Amino acid sequence: NSGATELTAEEKEALDEGLIALDGSLPIIKDKEAFEEKYGKITVQTLGSADRTIDVADTAMVKKWTEDTGIEFEWTEIPSESATEKINLQLVSGADLPDVFWTFGDGKSGNTVVQYADQDIFLPTENIIDEYMPNLKKILDDNPQYRQEITAPNGHTYGFPYIEEMKGLVLTPGPLIINKTWLDELSLEVPTTVDEWVECLKAFRDGGDLNGNGEDDAIPMAPWFGADDTFGSYNMFYRFTGAFGCADSYCGGNEYADHLRLVDGKVTFTALDEAFRKTAEFFNMLYDEGLIWNGSFEADSSAAYTASLIKEDVARIGCMGVWTDQEITNLDVHDQYVAVPRLQGEAGMTGSANNYSELQDSSNTAITTTCKFPHVVALFVDYMVGDPEIAVQSNWGAEGYNYVRDEEGILATPLDENGYYAGGTEEWNTFGLARANTTPARGSMIVLDEYYDTVCRYTYDAVTLLEWQKVNGKDDILAEYDTIPRVLMETDELTRLAQIQPTISDTVDRYIVDWVTNGVTDESWASYQSELEAAGVNDLVEIYQTAVDRAAENEAGSASSESAASTSSTSSAS
């Protein structure tokens, strides 16, 4: 099955009878009643949301889609918590399959379709995209890395991608911030070098009652050394590796690729670089100076500063990382902080990039081989992709709930005078509730950077986050570092990664805590290296190198076959 675009017998018949249009015009189903009487509805399975209090079929966007396209899907919702189990049972038995899997759970579509790629369950879609989906094809042509990320190891694509561009928001950690009020009180400038930053921390340590609560309880810096980090935002260690000569990478959204970077085109395990040791020595100095919060080493995330210190009614922390400024719930405390500029160190600058992508799922809206109307589904996705206003509302929630038109006619989230959410309804009174109850979300929507301020306003609760990231040096960091693309892997590669990567990651985490508290010796550095080797670090690098090379070859192959097709040349460059 080569991703052929042969129409099914049912599609040919419905086309002959004038029930459907496959030329890109709307509606796609021209006579809904006659179509459904003859063929029934196209069935779609999605994941339920705890926030959704109505049937997905009754959401505003689903009704809008039917109004525009004539397609009324028959929706089945399965509980999110047991979704992976249920979907695997469906796929193993091959029984009870829907025509379309809307989603498999956040970030899970790629591995799922690869795992079942040789079972003839999912329809390859690369040719359908090229021949029937001009809107999606253009986006993939304009962004070769996205085509690379949706191509399975066998060269096929399955389903269609979910892309949420937000000006690179998830491609670097959340902001590193410092208490400007305390700096002012101590007559200090915002630091621009690592040395100046250390001097600021020492001043916070010795500054007495900086927050005015009558106690000497200012904490100079609060990192958190546990796992479950959000986009590498809380563990300050990795931010400083670049200052010592080799930036590391750490990101919960793609954890198998933690500590990997492309350096001169080669996959490199950066936590073995000498810079990592120097960073550990530096953090041990900070610890010995009494600058690091003593709660930073708890294993349980409910004990992290983000769940405790950051929520108090007075500022407690001099410098910390956050994923979003909204984590600081007290407005007065919030307004004391500013972002730290990228700091110059002895052998480079601070900051790191995440091995992540704004293409969050490669294979949503996955069409099964039993679907009688695959081209109708494909044209539906291209309708959703091709109309930016539909794409934005399908992703984040409907107009009249999460969006109103501002004075320029652009979709904007309604906010009160304090900048808090003021949309939705009495029952759906948060952005999340109004989203869940007006769209199924997380299918194959595509939101592009170019839509901001032309179609919709930038997501209201991420405005400060992005500004602060830019102060941290986001643009330069993204230009300087080559990250590991989120490529799809063979099932046996994933199995091996699942065996070795958690041990590798735990080893790094364990040694960091030991080094920060006890210092680094030649012996401990040597035992760290040998433990990582025994855990399979060379295999890890090799698997990623193979996957990255294969994806590049697949991309070159598809590019050369396209150019060959366009010049009708007979030579092949595969």
Residue ranges and their predicted role:
Residues 1-197, 244-251, 255-258, 267-271, ...:
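Conserved N-terminal structural module of periplasmic/extracytoplasmic solute-binding proteins
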Residues 48-49, 383, 387-514, 519:
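Conserved small-residue motifs centered on glycine
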Residues 48, 197-200, 292, 328-331, ...:
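Conserved luminal/periplasmic juxtamembrane motif of membrane-embedded glycan-processing enzymes
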Residues 80-84, 300-303, 346-347:
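Short acidic loop-to-helix transition motifs that present clustered carboxylates
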Residues 126, 153-238, 258-311, 365-376, ...:
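Helix-loop-helix "hinge/cap" segment bordering the ligand-binding cleft or interdomain interface
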Residues 279-280, 284-291, 304-325, 333-336, ...:
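Glycine-rich, aromatic-lined ligand/substrate-binding cores of catalytic
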Residues 40-43, 69-74, 94-99, 120-123, ...:
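Loop/turn elements at helix/coil->beta-strand transitions in domains of secreted/extracellular proteins
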Residues 111-127, 329-352:
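Ligand-binding "clamshell"
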